[in-house]
């Protein structure tokens, strides 16, 4: 397996006086802010990265209908209608998606979608009028859909004709994140006096390692 990597870079600055006088730990605060910025960029790359000097996102691999699935592509299951679900048959489409996944992967599987898709899914009901989406059963737990947890990823596409807006699978087995060295911080008090520069870098890569471990719901007939 070979996965492309990217280097994330940031160089926040603070005055030496602020670092000396601040009531809070400025070094730690800057580190946390940079980590958050890096995490946002990583999340986008893991979903939609083109693999050119960055991770290859799982949505950029070839997609093929599950009936013609072959290693090296991501299998898709049709929702039954362009840009949505067939009226009254949303649960059937989700069941087809769940059982497109082999049993060994379903145990730790979850749904992944963005917040707009999740808002639409939360309104789905079964034939008895019960919501398919269920709130967390306890503090710290996740909401579930069809008995599986949901993960929100803003980088996933919206529901639209031919879009693959919902992913389902065991993502720990599906997608490998390569973290080369963690975050490195070089503190530079000389180059831009009176500012102290925090030269911050991180190398990260990623790509699909097991094409059997996740499937996509394609909103098509």
Regions found by a protein language model. Give the residues of each.
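Structured, hydrophobic secondary-structure cores that serve as assembly/anchoring elements
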Residues: 1-221
